[in-house]
Amino acid sequence: MSTLQHKTSSARRSSRRSVAAPDFVAVSRIPIVEVSPQLLDGTAPVKSTVDESFPVQATIFREGHDKFAARAVLVDGAGHTVDSVPMCDVSPGLFRFEGWLTPRVPGPHRFFVEAWSDPYATWLHNAEIKVPAGIDVGLVFAEAEVLFKAALKGTPVRSGERAAIRDALTVISKRRALPEVKLAAARSEEVRAAFAAYPVKELVSRSREYPVFVDRVRALVGSWYELFPRSVGATRDSESGEWTSGTLRTAATDLDRVAGMGFDVVYIPPVHPIGLTNRKGRNNSLTAVPGDPGSPYAIGSDAAGGHDAIEPSLGTFEDFDVFVGRAHELGMEVALDLALQCSPDHPWVKEHPEWFTARPDGTIAYAENPPKKYQDIYPLNFDNDPEGIYKEIKRVVELWVAHGVTIFRVDNPHTKPVGFWQRLLAEFRVEHPEVIFLAEAFTNPPMMQTLGTVGFHQSYTYFTWRNERQEIEEYLMEVSHESSHRMRPAFWPTTHDILTPYIQRGGISAAAIRAILAATGSPTWGIYNGYELIENIARPGAEEHIDNEKYEFKPRNYALAEQNGMATLLTMLNSIRSKHKALQRLRNVTINPTSNDKIVSFTKVARPEETADGVMDAVIVVVNLDPYASRDATVYLDLSPFGISPRWDGGPIIEVTDEMSGETYLWNEAPYVHLDPHGQVAHVLSVKVLS
């Protein structure tokens, strides 16, 4: 061998030795792959709430023809098993298995999938073929004796399951018993149930564990009502035209009305001091006149303070405590707007100029979302002093928690670093697990989804702009299935920022349609005050209310809401929601096709393990989407939630009661509906399956 050949050969051997074997995860004896749900490769917790079932899926298979079984298992933070359910093949041929787990207490949990070789199922499959054919009958029952004796060791003494297996074993062991008698004993319903409850397991395999965080129920279910405290009780002098602001105490007097409509969360915009520099006037004008209160989102003043202070015209912390206390007395929680931005007058601007972005000319950059400009707001720069900003914001949030705030509606979280939220929400999950954060993030789907992944409990959604049947159907399926493990939706027909063309043009009927869809389509929904007065006039060229409350006082006469019936409808919807667990659930939604593109229908279900009486609760919703004209349609019911099939003669299979009108109907699988936007625009139907 030449010197060159020797060097080349040595180099090749050295190269082979230096290449490390690739990392891999060993496949278990019974392969368990593609486990869901999981987030960030199983490092971030998926979402659930107390008594809310969630589905676990996995692809499970094995070599050969022997049978296997699987269970989904939920363990609490201490490692104790709190739920364990069999998994069923939901995609025959694809070996996709599913089981629904139901946590009962809040806090960190983990789930895993366990699979095993099932000798009883394998034996039974073989026996049902061999015994009738007279093949190896003696051997078949000899195997059964061994199997049933092993099963006896795993069943509790004096249990019904043990008795069933023992009795079957007695028959199987009789030498003179007929083979068909032995087989009948071995496959009786009692024996099958015993092996299901206490299976004989071989080749037990487990997936890795995946984290779940179980929140309190309000993280999933809530009826929100937004009001501006400064508008409630605001008065205007008839001679001078000067306004006197409403206060937190006058706003507290309005809470009885809100609670009377069935709302359980009262949401208020920022109550902090409002800056004077570049203060916005009415309808977002650049010039404010004396008496204009400014935008509550331009937070901070030299004299009164910043995020840890209260706008003097609203009152004091004592007044805030009165407001919160009254809300709690009425069974409502208070959600406070958390807007991480500053007016030019905010104390942080002078104390921490590094927390803002400086332009080349030395001025501070104000907020922009081209073509929109917010000259009265400075956005924070989270990169210059991230630790300093983090500590201060956490201090501020904890201050308001100490004053009884349990929910924060976070303004534009998508304009702040995701890592900031991940840290803040993780620490609050440990230190203040009762506190809920809603993301007001009308932004791109990846950002919305990731904000949910890192810990936001709820999110505003695109529901506001989903008006057509197909849009609504697709969006309901998206939020209830595809994204339910990471993002909980909140459906709002309008907000103080958004007034859609559909609401602008459709009048009372449009408002009713959207309220019904919001209240039934999502466990959390919300109404911005004035909705019950049909405030639907937009500022020209904008999708927001004219004379917007963000820039002026807006006292209202709510007696008018009784005349148009909207307050009655909102009250009815909240009452129906409180009565039906199905409307308090997100994941079990199915679409019912209809023969009319202007009529949408869907079914929502609460599983038996989610209800107090252990009986499935189901609601069918049918809505006319046309605010101008009556529509009729045939509704083609998806019967899978009820586990029933159509009758051979087309006769009725369910009894439905309209929770809005009180009328009861007998329906087959394809009922006819007629809905009038000026009368009954929708059906919200409870369901009873006919025997």
From Swiss-Prot:
What family does the Swiss-Prot or TrEMBL record give for this protein?
Answer: Belongs to the glycosyl hydrolase 13 family. GlgE subfamily.
Q: Does the keyword Signal apply?
A: no
Record's protein name: Alpha-1,4-glucan:maltose-1-phosphate maltosyltransferase
UniProt-annotated catalytic positions = 411 (nucleophile), 440 (proton donor)
Question: Keywords, A to Z?
Answer: Carbohydrate metabolism, Glycosyltransferase, Transferase
Q: Which GO terms describe its biological process?
A: alpha-glucan biosynthetic process
Q: Which domain of life is it from?
A: Bacteria
User: Assembly state and interactors?
Assistant: Homodimer.
